[in-house]
A protein has these predicted regions:
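Bacterial N-terminal signal peptides that target proteins for export
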Residues: 5-24, 31
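Formylglycine-dependent sulfatase
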Residues: 21-25, 40-508, 515-543, 547-560
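C-terminal segment of classical bacterial N-terminal signal peptides
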Residues: 28-37
Length: 560
């Protein structure tokens, strides 16, 4: 994120905004300099960072879903929900920014390692792993005396020198690659054996009855308990695989949502959007991106197609609730051990829902409908239900439209004031490290181990969390995105979006996100000065972050 003067404004508006920005700056300075503001006072807080994998913006009860998520919703009821929080369009770029506060094109994940284009390979920022030009929040907290624990999905480098223990975590139970089975078979997408580590060592087997959501949450609890009386605060990073496909569940969860989605995706999506409006997550007149042209109306499907589609969503919903139950297990533990009140808890999703279908083969076997959701099956839900998960937004994971990059963020506990608040502040995943370090009273250094490291590009959300300010960004601040050749710039309410064909127009389009969160009305012709201003910001973003547009892309008919 970079800032600049907003030349789109009239002279009078600039003078008015200058006064407003000055007042905000003075308030922020006063907040920053006041004794203990946003920082640890007598005791440094514990910090829990919880990440859902591929959960959509509209998949939580507190964001309008019919899926039962009582534990996440309880955090929302005592904390702050952010309605305009953005991430990258896929997992590893988001995670690199979430742990470093630095743009993914600097941190080494300018593209996912799996989709690195030939012209990107070997370029700085495109290593395909978390590089040494950045320092992780876990490293800084560890050096500041924190116990640091991780459990779950890593996806930021597969060599031992890239594993969590090399990036500041003292204990871990980790799936190193980007996905695979949730069960003990350790299968990857093509049935290959996936790499897991335990405290920095590769493991050969997982326990019988292993399930990712249950075992990762238990690992965090066990690590906290083992060192609970040593006097140190802890940073716990719980990186769920759920609800990422394949949808697999313990037997008692398989029929949790049986029959709940028989009315189909058109009805469920409309109901979610209405609930979002009632909750204040969406404005009453918010636009909605229409059902994708390649998705038939539910009423047009055959009975068999409806049966299968509804079952896919039943399993997905159960995955979300099962994850929530295991979050509840952790929160219950924190309360039972009198740790909850001094803990900052952050929950987010790493990107939009997965609407792209994977081609999987042997040994995965989906031939028996009654076995769906069990070991050996790889169930996905496709674009239609992904649109339900994304709510009113356009597209889903893999795209820098709002459906791919708008994610739920809930922050509760230490340093938050005003139970159940909804914040419309523009926030970004790069803000997470700055917020954590502010809470812990730990500065971000310019050097580490004698080497220069990239500065944090995020902003601490602490002034919003403690209700000192409504936003940490002014009208001249802007944010940039690029992934797979798709690109975007956002400044205040304006977003300039390039989506390649066949999913987009293959040129720049301008949207007013306040009036049009569904990105349905291109205002490029009506607002040429705004368009040119944001194009200039795009050029600055690309140059400052060493963006290399790919010559091949998994989402584009033709790249660049």
């Amino acid at each position: 994120m970079f800032s600049g003067s907003d030349t789109m404004l009239t002279a009078h508006k600039r003078r008015v905004l200058a006064k407003a920005v000055l007042c905000a700056a003075l308030a922020l300075a006063a907040w920053t300099l006041s004794p203990g503001a946003g920082l640890a006072q007598d005791r440094q807080p514990n910090i829990v960072l919880i990440v859902a994998d591929d959960a959509g913006y509209a998949d939580l009860g507190s964001f309008g879903s019919e899926i039962s998520t009582p534990n996440i919703d309880a955090l929302a009821s005592v904390g702050v929900r952010f309605t305009q929080f953005s991430v990258s369009a896929t997992c590893s770029p988001s995670r690199s920014m979430m742990l470093t506060g630095t743009d993914s094109h600097i941190a080494g994940l300018g593209n996912m390692a799996e989709f690195m284009a030939p012209n990107q390979k070997g370029k700085p920022g495109y290593e395909g792993y978390l590089n040494d030009r950045v320092v992780t929040v876990s490293t800084l907290l560890k050096d500041a005396g924190y116990n640091t624990y991780m459990a779950g999905k890593w996806h930021m480098g597969e060599e031992p020198r890239h594993w969590p223990v090399a990036r500041g975590f003292t204990r871990d139970q980790t799936l190193i690659p980007g996905g695979g089975s949730h069960l003990e078979d350790m299968w990857g997408l093509k049935g290959e054996r996936q790499l897991y580590t335990l405290n920095g060592k590769a493991v050969q087997t997982l326990r019988p009855g292993f399930h990712s959501s249950e075992d990762y949450s238990s690992a965090i609890i066990n690590n906290i308990e083992e060192n609970r009386t040593d006097g140190k605060p802890f940073f716990a990073y719980l990186a769920f695989q759920a609800p990422h496909d394949p949808f697999q569940l313990p037997s008692e969860w398989l029929n949790k949502y049986r029959g709940r989605y028989d009315r189909g995706y058109d009805v469920i999506r409309a109901e979610r959007i209405e609930r979002m409006k009632r909750l204040g997550i969406l404005a009453p007149d918010s636009t909605v991106y229409p059902r994708l042209s390649n998705v038939p109306a539910w009423s047009a499907l055959s009975d068999e197609a409806r049966r299968k589609s509804a079952r896919q969503m039943e399993l997905y919903a159960a995955m979300v609730e099962h994850m929530d139950a295991n979050i509840g297990k952790l929160i219950e533990y924190l309360k039972a051990k009198s740790l909850y009140d001094n803990t900052l808890i952050i929950f987010l999703s790493d990107n939009g829902p997965e609407g792209n279908a994977w081609n999987v083969g042997s040994p995965w076997d989906n031939s028996r409908f009654e076995d769906w959701g069990k070991k050996g099956t790889f169930i996905q839900y496709g674009a239609a239900w992904a649109q339900v998960s994304a709510g009113p937004f356009r597209l889903f994971k893999g795209f820098v439209s709002e459906g791919g990059i708008r994610a739920p963020l809930i922050v509760a506990g230490h340093g938050t004031r005003g139970s159940g608040r909804i914040s419309n502040a523009v926030a970004h995943v790069m803000d997470i490290p700055a917020t954590i370090l502010s809470a812990a009273g730990v500065p971000h250094p310019g050097t580490y181990n004698g080497n220069n490291v990239a500065p944090s590009q995020g902003k601490s959300l602490a002034p919003v969390l403690d209700n000192s300010l409504v936003s940490v960004r002014g009208p001249s601040d802007w944010l940039g995105w690029e992934l797979f050749g798709n690109r975007a710039i956002r400044q205040d309410k304006w977003k300039l979006l390039w989506l390649c064909e066949p999913h987009g127009a293959g040129n720049w389009q301008l949207y007013d996100l306040d009036a049009d969160p569904g990105e349905t009305n291109d205002l490029s012709s009506a607002q040429p000065k705004v368009r040119e201003q944001l194009l200039a910001h795009w050029a600055e973003y690309a140059a400052s972050n060493n963006v290399v547009l790919p010559d091949s892309s998994p989402t584009c008919a033709k790249a660049n």
